[in-house]
């Protein structure tokens, strides 16, 4: 698997709660291309809890939405917006775990409408939550007008273990 570059690094005003590494209260997600899927390893901690030692459901929803957005960005080379999102919470995500795996895949595409599925998986491989997201993708010219920059896979091939190690530092 290879890391996806973040093309907005250094762009004035870029402060995405989910993926900007410079946002002091953000999630600082990094993304990787794993076959056809986009993957992120999210390090856990008590700052993200709702109930004691439990990851807040709103944080889970944000992780699921953002991974789908990056799947769209990489797949189509354009931007888009979430038009519908349905989240199912299957089991608690414990903030005492070192990390979770967040993954997105394309289910269906009809012209500029995409159906994506995202999952949150525990370190032991259990499904914790998932979302089905419908996205509206912008025509490339519209995306350029609003400052969209495409992302691409960069660097050397990495194993899952290497991605986990570099993500939970």
Summary of predicted features, one role per range:
Residues 1-7, 94-96, 107-169:
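HotDog/MaoC-like acyl-thioester-processing domains
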Residues 1-46, 151-169:
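Non-catalytic linker/capping segments at the edges of enzyme domains
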Residues 32-34, 90, 105-109:
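Short beta-strand micro-motifs enriched in acidic
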Residues 39-63:
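A conserved, well-ordered hydrophobic junction motif at loop->secondary-structure transitions
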Residues 40, 83-85, 100-102, 116, ...:
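Hydrophobic residues positioned within well-ordered beta-strands of beta-sheet architectures
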Residues 42-44, 89, 137:
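Hydrophobic residues in beta-strands and at strand termini
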């Amino acid at each position: 698997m290879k890391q996806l570059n973040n093309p907005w690094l250094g762009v004035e005003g870029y402060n995405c709660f989910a993926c900007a590494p410079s946002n002091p209260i953000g999630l600082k997600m990094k993304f990787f291309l794993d076959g056809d899927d986009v993957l992120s390893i999210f390090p856990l901690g008590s700052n993200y809890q709702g109930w004691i030692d439990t990851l807040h459901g709103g944080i889970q929803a944000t992780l699921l939405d953002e991974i789908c957005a990056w799947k769209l960005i990489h797949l189509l080379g354009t931007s888009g917006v979430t038009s519908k999102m349905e989240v199912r919470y299957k089991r608690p995500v414990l903030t005492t775990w070192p990390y979770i795996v967040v993954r997105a895949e394309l289910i269906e595409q009809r012209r500029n409408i995409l159906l994506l599925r995202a999952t949150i998986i525990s370190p032991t491989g259990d499904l914790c939550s998932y979302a089905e997201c419908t996205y509206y993708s912008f025509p490339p010219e519209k995306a350029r007008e609003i400052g969209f920059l495409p992302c691409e896979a960069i660097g050397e091939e990495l194993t899952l273990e290497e991605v986990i190690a570099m993500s939970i530092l």
